Amino acid sequence: MASKAKNTAAAAKAEGTAKRRIRKIFGDIHEVVKMPNLIEVQRESYEQFLRSNKEIDYVSGLEKTLRSVFPIRDFAGTAELDFVHYELEPPKYDTTECRQRGITYAAPMKVTLRLIVFEVDQETETRSVLDIKEQDVYMGDMPLMTGNGTFIINGTERVIVSQMHRSPGVLFDHDRGKTHSSGKLLFAARVIPYRGSWLDFEFDAKDIVNVRIDRKRKLPVTALLYALGLDSEEILHFFYNTVTWKRAGGKKGEGWKIPFEPEAWRGQKPTFALVDAKTGEEVFPANQKISPRAANKAQKDGLKDLLLPTEEVFARYAAKDMIDEKTGRIYIEAGDEVGPDHLEALDAAGIDELELLDIDEINTGPWIRNTLKVDKAENRDEGLEAIYKVMRPGEPPTKETAEALFEGLFFDGERYDLSAVGRVKLNMRLDLDAEDTVTTLRKEDILAVVKELVGLKDGKGDVDDIDNLGNRRVRSVGELLENQYRVGLLRMERAVKERMSSVDVSTVMPNDLINAKPAVAAVREFFGSSQLSQFMDQTNPLSEVTHKRRVSALGPGGLTRERAGFEVRDVHPTHYGRICPIETPEGPNIGLINSLSTFARVNKYGFIETPYRVVKDGKVTSEVIYLSAMEEQKHTVAQASAELTEDGTFVEELISARQNGDNLMAPSETVTLMDVSPKQLVSVAASLIPFLENDDANRALMGSNMQRQAVPLVKAEAPWVGTGMEETVARDSGAAITATRGGIVDQVDATRIVIRAIGDVEPGQSGVDIYTLQKFQRSNQNTCINQRPLVKVGETVEAGDVIADGPSTDLGELALGKNTLVAFMPWNGYNYEDSILISERIVKDDVFTSIHIEEFEVMARDTKLGPEDITRDIPNVGEEALRNLDEAGIVYIGAEVHPGDILCGKITPKGESPMTPEEKLLRAIFGEKASDVRDTSLRLPPGVAGTVVEVRVFNRHGIEVDDRTRAIQQEEIERLRKDSQDERTILNRATYNRLRDMLLGQTASAAPKGVKKGVKIDEALLEGIDRHEWFKFAVADDNRQQQIEAVKSQYDEAAKGIDDKFEDRKEKLERGDELAPGVLKMVKVFVAVKRKLQPGDKMAGRHGNKGVISRILPVEDMPFLEDGTPVDIVLNPLGVPSRMNVGQIFETHLGFAARGLGQQVKNALEDWRAANPDPEAGKPPEAVKETLQRVYGDRYEDDIAGRSNAEIIELASNLTAGVPMGTPVFDGAREGDVTTQLEAAGIDSSGQSVLYDGRTGEAFDRKVTVGIIYMLKLHHLVDDKIHARSIGPYSLVTQQPLGGKAQFGGQRFGEMEVWALQAYGAAYTLQEMLTVKSDDVVGRTKVYEAIVKGDDTFEAGIPESFNVLVKEMRSLGLNVELSSLTDGDEDDDGLQIAAE
């Protein structure tokens, strides 16, 4: 065990933020392999699609798709259009610009096509090339993937979710006895291609083998075999062995001799005695079971032939036709049952040998023979005809059409494609050896499938499991888009063919033939509206990562929710290490949408693989291999937690292992593989839950899902009790910025970091990296994306170091919530049923405050009555309402806005109405404007109040630019200019430093003005000359001179690159924007809203412990600890036992210990600071170092000892609040570890403390569990849900108020509420609810008028929905009328009808 611990410490040291803060990891298991990048799935797949790299053997690619459609030939064969190659040009706008302008991030695609024109000789029909033309054709834009694995489509980030579908190949299955009443198993086989017709083979209730093509009407399978070119005898010989029966002794009654095969007789119980044909002895008596041992012994004893009675020949089947050559008389046909008449005929002809099929009804059944007899077809033509009739009913078949149809179904690469995957699966299942380039079916494949199916019926082998991950594969972005693009290209091909036949081919160019619209439309449709192209969940970095790693079984070509049964949704043993058994949505999609496990990756065939360590001769090596579910089947896999000795052998004799889906205790020498890590089982979200092993699965599921809904807070704080995965997620999600190469920090401010690269810069590369930070950007979910620098000027960074924190990250670690002090106790019913009681301190100190950014936009369009105008000059609006607007009518940045405030003034012309003379006069006096326009300004909707953080103005090209737009443009150009200048400065500095080193000590063979030739160049000489002149030196050393010239050309190239980039961006800014048709100007206003925690907000821990805030209590009333610290949150202890998520209690205790240890570090640091006011001249902080070593233990001793004083102080000051711990999933702190930490922190090892009531000051009756829990604030905020309505929109038909906040709707008074009022007998309230408060149109207007006047009487009329009912009845021909009866009149039934 010791060896493991050291390894882990080394690993911990090697990884990132340990510089600023060490997370104390409790895990014992050393991980041999690094976790693959978390968004590799997306990037890898799209990279394969976009650039089919020539060096690597890619399976898919855009080029492959283009090659599969081209060459396109015209109908007459006089021309063909061929594909040469394609290239993607650089995109017009970068990702930021695309987001701002609302356009797609894509690269224009140029395809080089070659048009070959042939001349056809009329007589000989030979073709000769007449003309060849090549041309580059623009084929639309191809969306590009951003560095983080997303696409920007129309300005919004989208993710393409991978799809899980049935793998192409062959599947054998049975109906589980459900079809037939007897419960007998009907076996079936299905060949699934990647595209093309499905081929199904199935047994029916009469045990006949049938075939279906594309799920159409079934045919006997022999019809298909005939069509493949076999005759009945070949069919029988393929499926059955033959046995030669010879007459014994030639006399009629003596019986028949057959060779003795021990396998055939094992376990059988013949009704007759088995006699040795040679000796005549009885070997096995009648009606006795023959054991395998006895059968083998008989063979050893020399038994060669058996003698069987003549009756045994009857009811067996002939293997071939027996015909009298001379007369042509048929004695017996192949497949016929042998009867006494046949024997007589054969005896008469003197034939004493019979070839019979080896069908014994036990090991081999007569299924194919029976099918042959049922089949009406008897030769190839009839077989083809039968297939044609099923596929094209109603059309008369000719031999040619039938043959062409059959060929096209399975043997034509254009229409049928198994894909490499399908071929590999077919080969594996049926033991074939075709190359994986053979992607159509072959005759052998079909025969092998039928043979395997018949074998299953005979009890040989097993059926496949559809839910095994070996039979399901993943289609990622690249492949999905490839399929879509292919569809588009095929549509385009049709158009091109028609075009080629309608124009004169000799005069046209490829450009005239190609119309790329269908291909572009297919791509656009896929990204815009496919079920798998989803709006990215950007709530926090974890939700982004999870969304990209999601695998869905839904979508085109997948399952639907309604049809998916239990089996598909269930966890399967092959999910281990591939798909997370925990993380899946609750609700109708459960089990259909999954997440990849942490170490999983998708191989080139689309199967999910997971890594294992190789075990050789009982010794665990450090070699790691990735295996798919199929490859893993034959192995015995030990768990990652199995104990090992120093040299890697297993400590125990028997080891807990898995084999083919079963858990067993295996002897250590039989183990062949070992897990690489305990967390390879779970997904990213689940691996972030500490003490996951102590939580119930259902709650762990909720915990994983709710972490994805945590809102980024104003001040992020990493969890004190984590799992060590936090850093990986922050880094791979792209939320935290990492340095692309090592260097020295040159400049830092809030919006950018400039790093000067160290070491030799490759030619053509810039020697400086500028990282632009995102400031207060809006995410897809309206949360705030804000990045903060972590580095200081002069600091040295290495490639991969975190240099800036993003949303929900703290020092490069994921930080979704806050560490809060929690007590588990009831408090006056305020935490009944999962409610949460919180302290006012949390609100006051902005602990759970988050910023949300809302976007509002307004467009000025060109209307029929004239253009709309964005202006400050709005009719009937006072100066007070315009206080926040500038001259252009757009709100200032920094303005505080409230509901109803104008964000952007806009006026729209309204139709001319005829004017009265008075109006005309007023108009003449007071000017035009006022009456012919109406106010359509953008106002802040109710429920939103905040600060304007950004305004963007977009103008159509050619429209005059207003001042505000000009100001925004100038600001942006200044920023670009600054970037450009900084890059130039650093380039100059680096170049001249290199040049100085090269020139010093050299002899000048040429020199700038004022310097003599032949001088030796030294420091003083160089200092006296302007740096720009240095390049004029030439030196005598030729070698050095070449180097100097190389530096010069490199410098010129880099400088030109910097200038070009600046000019290009500036030009883009000054160019007009591409707006939707009819839009002249668009303004976007971003308002930042601060959301404090308030009652009704939802909070949760990481263990599925969720609740809603019920009350915010003043600090002084909260229960407090002995040292006077009030707790932050009071949770209900009853939420733990029934839910069985005990992990939260472990977390509470360990978190409390972390807080206590942090306190100790803080005290040591404060003592040192008090003794050393001047840290530079002070003593080394030995006491602080000792405290740190005590807190962290032996494992981190070397790390802490190796740090400088300044680093020790920085480390300690980051730990004063609490010491971060890491308890990896399934390998974390045990109960003993938690107790030890509590004791080290000086806390009672029970983890319980005496609490005092804040209101009375008395101690509570018994000790209470108090500790630190990491709480998250979830995206379900009460502000987004609550709203109020007085009068609002009504539904058109029923005239009832709409529902929901988005529609500004009302509260539904439903059936149950009506029953409640009925039960109370509240007749008038009920009448009011159902009439004037709902859909009595006249009544509700009257009520409104009455209320305005201060009156409170009203009269209920007929609800509109009653009128709708009446009209519906009339539409059915039932006339219903309401007529009022005078008092005293009764209708026929004696019922009084009230007056209308």
Swiss-Prot record:
It catalyses: RNA(n) + a ribonucleoside 5'-triphosphate = RNA(n+1) + diphosphate. Its EC number is 2.7.7.6. GO terms for molecular function: DNA binding; DNA-directed RNA polymerase activity; ribonucleoside binding. Keywords: DNA-directed RNA polymerase, Nucleotidyltransferase, Transcription, Transferase. It holds the Pfam family RNA_pol_Rpb2_45. Signal peptide: none annotated. InterPro entries: DNA-dir_RNA_pol_bsu_ext_1_sf, DNA-dir_RNA_pol_bsu_external_1, DNA-dir_RNA_pol_su2, DNA-dir_RNAP_su2_dom, DNA-dir_RNAP_su2_hyb_sf, RNA_pol_bsu_bac, RNA_pol_bsu_CS, RNA_pol_bsu_protrusion. It comes from the Bacteria. NCBIfam families: PRK00405.1, rpoB. The RNAP catalytic core consists of 2 alpha, 1 beta, 1 beta' and 1 omega subunit. When a sigma factor is associated with the core the holoenzyme is formed, which can initiate transcription. Belongs to the RNA polymerase beta chain family. This is DNA-directed RNA polymerase subunit beta. The lineage of its organism: Bacteria, Pseudomonadati, Pseudomonadota, Alphaproteobacteria, Sphingomonadales. The gene is rpoB.
